[in-house]
Amino acid sequence: MLAKPLTAIWTLFLLISTAQAQFQFFEQMFGGGGAQQGHPHEQEASSDSAWYQRTWEGAHCTRYLCPGTLSCVHFPHHCPCPHPNVEDKVELGEGSAVCVSRGGFAPGEAARKIELARKGLL
């Protein structure tokens, strides 16, 4: 007699816990419920340039403000690369420079390829 009610309660418990686990999965996948569970909710970066424009306008620089890094330097070709751990800065002459991905090449390989391309050899 006692087995049927226990089986029914156990089945109900399994169904409820499975449903709750599924809803938690969907909440996490679609970003819902984070603040309710006490997790810090980080705001994603904006898809427009408003943050960049505010930061650019608020930067104080009496020389040249680099557009990629917002660094204040004496000349545009002195601007650092935004990602120096994976990029090399290559000066093109006439006060201009570009940052190129190293891509696993040997040191100086990116600069060599750019120079070959400028000469029309690549």
Swiss-Prot record:
Domain of life of the native organism: Eukaryota
Protein keywords: Signal
InterPro entries given in the database record: LCL2 (IPR034543)
RNA-binding keyword on record: no
Protein's GO biological process: ERAD pathway
Keyword Signal: yes
Coiled-coil annotated spans: none
Stretch forming the signal peptide: 1-21
Family: Belongs to the LCL2 family.
Main function: Probable component of the endoplasmic reticulum-associated degradation (ERAD) pathway.
Name the record gives this protein: Long chronological lifespan protein 2
Organism: Talaromyces stipitatus (strain ATCC 10500 / CBS 375.48 / QM 6759 / NRRL 1006)
